[in-house]
Amino acid sequence: EIARQLGIVSAPAAVPGGEDAASSIKALTGVEIESLSFDELKNVVDEVNVFARVAPEHKLKIVQALQAKGHIVAMTGDGVNDAPALRKADIGVAMGIAGTDVSKEASDMVLLDDNFATIVAAVQEGRTIYDNIRKFVRFSVAGNIGKVLVMLIAPFLGKPLPLLPLQLLWLNLLTDGLLGLGMGVENPEPDIMKRKPTSPTEGVFSRGAGTQTIWVGVMIGALALSLGSWYYFTGRPEWQTMIFTSLAFMQVFQALASRSNKESLFKLGVMSNPLLAGMALLVVALQLAVLYFPVLSKFFEVLPLSGYDLMTAASMGLFVFAVMELEKKFKK
């Protein structure tokens, strides 16, 4: 009855087959848990809706049984006797107001307001942070794959060094630094609380992320090399500047397309992450300053580009953006 009042289980109602909801609710008491072996408890723990009148040692046993079934377990508690189960759980949650010092020390998280709804908000925040870390790592690695390919393959095509060390450092500062800041505060995915917990053994590049990172990096490198080669073999002196600038534009558009794994930027809205939008504009402005301010262009050893050349470099970024957006559509 208490579980129904708290909303843990539904109120009694008719169910298919003539059973009522009360008979479909499975509960275990501490006495029943005591009579079960660990293997028996493990076999039934997934089916139990309510655990009632359990002692601290029973809580520990329940946590261990759930973990043995491969679940990620969060345990709440406020007393000294809850400490073993709090410590054993993947996430121990202690009460900040009613909790004892021992329970707080044994926990990973403390609810300052003793409100269980705060746990849901904390889970969402944690998943969002993890998602954003994955997005940034994939974005950064893909961009670096592109730059490495440019540096490694260009000499085999009969060209001098395509990028100077200072230019590489500048690109990394703009992309990993400024764009990374914007990606770090991305909003949560729409389905973030409908997903199953991430497995502790799952890597950053799992679920196809590694494959996507590689092909995006190869695409960036191939586009920059193709553009630079066209300008080089047609005798254009600004071929290095075209590689340098196209890489900057491609990573700006790559960052915008990397905001969500499923949703299009047009659905999200550019200004739904104002920091990233601002950083993208800042990166473009800084890159243009390097091209057109004589002191900076001399320092970075680049040549000013014509309007046509600048649009050509920007079109490489638009191409990367279009391909990444189309991939999301086909995945759906």
Language-model regions: role of each:
Residues 6-13, 68-71, 94-97, 111-113, ...:
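Secondary-structure transition/capping motifs at alpha-helix termini
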Residues 2, 62-63, 89, 106-107, ...:
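Short beta-alpha junctions and helix-cap segments that line functional grooves
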Residues 1-65, 69, 76, 83, ...:
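Cytosolic catalytic headpieces and adjacent flexible linkers of membrane translocases
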Residues 30, 81-144, 185, 189-193:
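Mg2+-dependent phosphoryl-transfer enzymes with acidic/Ser/Thr/Gly-rich catalytic loops
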Residues 20-26, 51, 72-73, 91, ...:
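Hydrophobic packing and interface segments
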Residues 122-332:
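C-terminal transmembrane helices and immediately adjacent loops/tails
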Residues 2-5, 85-86, 133, 294:
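Hydrophobic residues within well-ordered alpha-helices
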Residues 76, 80, 84, 103, ...:
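Acidic (Asp/Glu-rich) catalytic motifs at the cytosolic membrane interface
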